[in-house]
Amino acid sequence: MLANLKIRTGMFWVLSLFSLTLLFSTASAWWAAVGSDQQITELDQTAHQSDRLNNALLMAIRSSANVSSGFIEQLGGHDESAGKRMALSVELNNKSQTLVDEFVENAREPALRVLATELQATFAEYAKAVAGQREATRQRSLEQYFKVNSDAGNAMGRLQTLRQQLVTTLSERGQQIMLESDRRLARAQLLSLCLLGMTVVLAVLCWAFIAQRVLHPLREAGGHFRRIASGDLSVPVQGQGNNEIGQLFHELQRMQQSQRDTLGQINNCARQLDAAASALNAVTEESANNLRQQGQELEQAATAVTEMTTAVEEVARNAITTSQTTSESNQLAAQSRRQVSENIDGTEAMTREIQTSSAHLQQLVGQVRDIGKVLEVIRSVSEQTNLLALNAAIEAARAGEAGRGFAVVADEVRTLAYRTQQSTQEIEQMIGSVQAGTEAAVASMQASTNRAQSTLDVTLASGQVLEGIYSAIGEINERNLVIASAAEEQAQVAREVDRNLLNIRELSNHSAAGAQQTSEASKALSGLVGEMTALVGRFKV
């Protein structure tokens, strides 16, 4: 069955199996990539949830702290500053409420959903307590302020507890996602090993098929071709089936038999040609006229050779002139190659300097970010100092006249904390501007690096082209020298041919007597040669 299998059919099945394996490998890789993308997206959402939670609580604390600062400033008679504090507290409260709502909306797991709902309810209580603080501040009611401040503290404690639980839940979910990713990776590795094994098996089967059904018959056919080319037709060609290889052997068998028949006919013609050649020696007298005509043509040929000698000498002179011009072009090409090499070195140095500057700017961006982190810590410390000053002022107010001096000191501390907070915000704005400018400079330096690299690539390509031109001009110069030398040799040969033609003309006159007998024998020989030509024409070269 395999002996009659078509080669194209076998190759079709081989390619089909490889295509199916490749398709299955691609599909499995696509499936793994989609799963990994989903896990990465879920992990990113988990990180965003943690950020929303922390930012919401931070803004809630800052909202309450601004109310406390506003209350102290209002007690001190700074109504305008207290109003700004109240407005900032409302803004921070709204932002934190938005973050909490987004956290609840994106909490999809049941356990996380329950904690998120509880967080939303507790945050509503805290927001209500902070609103009560703002109302007590507007009414200048110290008693009411202390009452709602206690409620806010209790609510904040519950919020901190819920935050810790939510952070733990989110962390566990992240670890679960990583475990699922590890399991997916293990499955992908096992599948890759299986596909590799299938590919190796298919490759071995394909090689066995090709070696047995294609290479071995082709080697055998090559042996037949070598024997036929050397004239050995004694080994018969055997068939190999009905496929393409079998058809090749059938045609080879036909060619062998055809050559045998042709060789037999050529042998018969050769015997007849031998008899005609024996009579040719006695009938050369008729060639005398042809020899006389040959003498005249030799005279014309001698004249033509003389003219050819003059033309060849002119070619030699032109070749020498061209060689000189090519040498000048070669010098110009060498100068251009040196200039391109210098340009390449300068462009490479400029690219390295731009890359070094880009690295320094990247370091500057990192240092600016570190300064921003330090400013965040300073701002947090100033807020805590403000709260401590507020508590100190409250305690001084309770102490009456005995705590007045302490109240003045607490007010000064609060003022310093407030100024520190404002200065920190201004520095953060300046740091943001510096960071934006630095990142723009980094992008510009990267663009310059890319343009410099493009220029370097173009210059390198130009250098390669000039190198090719330089090599081509050198080769042209060498060939021109060869042409000039060959033309000179041809001129000498032409002069020698002229002398030989004169000698041949003399010899042809002496051969006229024997040429007459050659004519009749040539007629018989022409018929035999025509028959042999027809037989040989059966072979296609």
UniProtKB/Swiss-Prot annotation:
Residues 212-264 form the HAMP domain. It is found in: Cell inner membrane. Keywords: Cell inner membrane, Cell membrane, Chemotaxis, Membrane, Methylation, Transducer, Transmembrane, Transmembrane helix. It comes from the Bacteria. GO terms for molecular function: transmembrane signaling receptor activity. Residues 269-505 form the Methyl-accepting transducer domain. Its main location: membrane. GO terms for biological process: chemotaxis; signal transduction. Residues 32-189 are periplasmic. It is a multi-pass membrane protein. The keyword Calcium does not apply. Residues 322-341 are annotated as: Disordered. The chain crosses the membrane at residues 11-31, 190-210. Residues 1-10, 211-541 are cytoplasmic. Belongs to the methyl-accepting chemotaxis (MCP) protein family. PANTHER family: METHYL-ACCEPTING CHEMOTAXIS PROTEIN MCPB (PTHR32089), METHYL-ACCEPTING CHEMOTAXIS PROTEIN TLPQ (PTHR32089:SF120). This is Methyl-accepting chemotaxis protein PcaY. It comes from Pseudomonas putida (strain ATCC 700007 / DSM 6899 / JCM 31910 / BCRC 17059 / LMG 24140 / F1).
